[in-house]
Structure formats: C-alpha cells, structure tokens
Amino acid sequence: MSGGSTGERPFSDIITSIRYWIIHSITIPSLFVAGFLFVSTGLAYDAFGTPRPNEYFTQDRQQIPLVNDRFSAKQELEDLTKGL
C-alpha cells in the first residue's frame, strides 16, 4: 500500500481550475505593478535608506570613500564623513 492521503487537493486539480486562474490573473500582475511603482517612485530608496544614484557623490567629494589603513580606520572614516 502506498502513502496515505493528506486530504488536500492535488496540485494538478488546483492549477487547472478556472477559479485559480481568475484569482491569479489579478494578483500576479498587481504584484508586478506594485513593485514597479515602489522602485520608480523612489519609495524603495526611502524605505531601505539607500542613497539615490545622484547622491553617491557630492559636489565637494568626488573620490571614492576608501579606507587605506586599517589601524587608523576610525580616523579615516571620521574624515570621510565630515560634512555629510
């Protein structure tokens, strides 16, 4: 005797039902639209605290903020972030 039944509907029955496709034909495109709006409006930058592409380099600081000496890293970071 093979394994017992859990009483759940078989997956093949679910994906071939009209009800499944009516529900998912609305929800799946809605998720893509919501994601597009989340990114295109800039809300993603605000929500996650990442700088926008035009905010990586200021007019005063055009070089890459690179730490060169690991023993004086704290002082270098303070110098790099001064004026932010």
Curated annotation (Swiss-Prot):
Keywords on record: Chloroplast, Electron transport, Heme, Iron, Membrane, Metal-binding, Photosynthesis, Photosystem II, Plastid, Thylakoid, Transmembrane, Transmembrane helix, Transport
Any Pfam family hit: Cytochrom_B559
GO terms, molecular function: electron transfer activity; heme binding; iron ion binding
Transmembrane segments: 22-36
Membrane topology: Single-pass membrane protein
GO biological process, one term: photosynthetic electron transport chain
UniProt xrefs under Gene3D superfamilies: Photosystem II cytochrome b559, alpha subunit
One of the record's GO cellular component terms: photosystem II reaction center
Cofactor note: With its partner (PsbF) binds heme. PSII binds additional chlorophylls, carotenoids and specific lipids.
Keyword Ion transport among UniProt keywords: no
Signal peptide as annotated in the record: none
Cofactor(s) annotated in UniProt: heme b
Source superkingdom: Eukaryota
Assembly: Heterodimer of an alpha subunit and a beta subunit. PSII is composed of 1 copy each of membrane proteins PsbA, PsbB, PsbC, PsbD, PsbE, PsbF, PsbH, PsbI, PsbJ, PsbK, PsbL, PsbM, PsbT, PsbX, PsbY, PsbZ, Psb30/Ycf12, at least 3 peripheral proteins of the oxygen-evolving complex and a large number of cofactors. It forms dimeric complexes.
Family designation: Belongs to the PsbE/PsbF family.
Role according to the record: This b-type cytochrome is tightly associated with the reaction center of photosystem II (PSII). PSII is a light-driven water:plastoquinone oxidoreductase that uses light energy to abstract electrons from H(2)O, generating O(2) and a proton gradient subsequently used for ATP formation. It consists of a core antenna complex that captures photons, and an electron transfer chain that converts photonic excitation into a charge separation.
Name of this chain's protein: Cytochrome b559 subunit alpha
Organism of derivation: Emiliania huxleyi
Gene name for this UniProt entry: psbE
